Amino acid sequence: MIWHVQNENFILDSTRIFMKAFHLLLFDGSLIFPECILIFGLILLLMIDSTSDQKDIPWLYFISSTSLVMSITSLLFRWREEPMISFSGNFQTNNFNEIFQFLILLCSTLCIPLSVEYIECTEMAITEFLLFVLTATIGGMFLCGANDLITIFVAPECFSLCSYLLSGYTKKDVRSNEATMKYLLMGGASSSILVHGFSWLYGSSGGEIELQEIVNGLINTQMYNSPGISIALIFITVGIGFKLSPAPSHQWTPDVYEGSPTPVVAFLSVTSKVAASASATRIFDIPFYFSSNEWHLLLEILAILSMILGNLIAITQTSMKRMLAYSSIGQIGYVIIGIIVGDSNDGYASMITYMLFYISMNLGTFACIVLFGLRTGTENIRDYAGLYTKDPFLALSLALCLLSLGGLPPLAGFFGKLYLFWCGWQAGLYFLVLIGLLTSVVSIYYYLKIIKLLMTGRNQEITPHVRNYRRSPLRSNNSIELSMIVCVIASTIPGISMNPIIAIAQDTLF
């Protein structure tokens, strides 16, 4: 009799939970429609992989790319709608979150064509690769709209788990296994630090988990200036710092960049920074509203260290991927300036604009590296010597992307940095802007050093890799070159296109 009653109670409780979940999905599901499209694409990929004996590679890529494009389209149709909070306060949709979701979808859409020939040449499992990329994209999108501490913790873990698997995807490569182990250990440590910071925030606010409710809780408990909030700020900054990889939280970046497959590095180098930047702006701006001076100081220190160390160490690198790793550390220092400025003086707008240009510049550079690596089998900088004599198109594309990363006019990177530094100067961050200008000059030096190698015609400097260079006859090259062309064009657009981009970015302020 007792067992029968307990069984009935269990069934009733399960039914209530199911009905509540169904109610949430029915009434709030439209607010995560872009994410649902990607989930449907994931299910479709799994069904095809489990029912088909022979893998139809073009069809798998078509499904992945189509789901991403459809998700972008649904996101654009929702633009300028009223901000809404759904799923019992766990998720928020507004223009600010959606622009970051758009950037993540754009990254994934451009990264998938980069991986076509690479996966074929390395004989990697195609379906699993696409599943991990789409799942990481979903995790990044949920992180952009996360409105409570639990979702802010779970969403990046979804992204991180897929990132660990992608970085170790070439299991026979010792460097890839080493990169995965370092990435996993550092990621686990940072997650524990982050959740410890959340526990301090949760306790200080009186048990609140929603971001705005945490602010109200801190006011009610009079704990907004307590030592507990300072401890929470330090731990959360360290935890988020791992995702952004500024100095001194950058130790994992060079090894993971060098050991991971190049298309994976291209994906991680942009999506992780976009998602982490979106999360950082909301966490610092809302729960730590009363501690703005403290987190401004912390981020200023991180920005200075990142810009100086990242660009100085990049000069000494001999591997193209390690050089780009340290370059990305310097680039995130520039992005942090926009986070510090905030919604005043167009700080967020300048950060979004620069990140859009950074996506095109960085992915364009990695597209060139993928092509060169597949045709020569090397990633050393010195092996690029004389590439212009064999493949002028690839050499010029790489040169334009590198010059744009350095911020030379009239390329897109120059106008992005100009807008970012101008907003920082208007906000009174004179020292940060001066450091940014000086380190930008340093970055131009090592970018020009590579371009000089590309254009050299001396036979004694040209390595056997370039002497024996042959353009691959495979048709799949067209997808990599298509992504490269799109990124190069976006990296070289003139300043005349800046006004509409800035106007769109300014509309995202919450």
Curated annotation (Swiss-Prot):
InterPro entries attached to this UniProt entry: NADH-Q_OxRdtase_suN/2, ND/Mrp_TM, Ndh2_N
UniProt superkingdom: Eukaryota
Localization: Plastid, Chloroplast thylakoid membrane
Coiled coil feature spans: none
Enzyme class at the top of the EC tree: translocase
Membrane-spanning residues: 24-44, 57-77, 99-119, 124-144, 149-169, 183-203, 227-247, 295-315, 323-343, 354-374, 395-415, 418-438, 484-504
One example of a Gene Ontology biological process annotation: ATP synthesis coupled electron transport
Known EC number: 7.1.1.-
Alphabetical keyword list: Chloroplast, Membrane, NAD, NADP, Plastid, Plastoquinone, Quinone, Thylakoid, Translocase, Transmembrane, Transmembrane helix, Transport
Main location: plastid
Catalytic reaction(s) noted: a plastoquinone + NADH + (n+1) H(+)(in) = a plastoquinol + NAD(+) + n H(+)(out); a plastoquinone + NADPH + (n+1) H(+)(in) = a plastoquinol + NADP(+) + n H(+)(out)
NCBIfam families, sorted: NDH_I_N, PRK02504.1
Function comment: NDH shuttles electrons from NAD(P)H:plastoquinone, via FMN and iron-sulfur (Fe-S) centers, to quinones in the photosynthetic chain and possibly in a chloroplast respiratory chain. The immediate electron acceptor for the enzyme in this species is believed to be plastoquinone. Couples the redox reaction to proton translocation, and thus conserves the redox energy in a proton gradient.
Protein name (Swiss-Prot/TrEMBL): NAD(P)H-quinone oxidoreductase subunit 2 A, chloroplastic
Species for this entry: Lactuca sativa
Species lineage: Eukaryota, Viridiplantae, Streptophyta, Embryophyta, Tracheophyta
Gene label: ndhB1
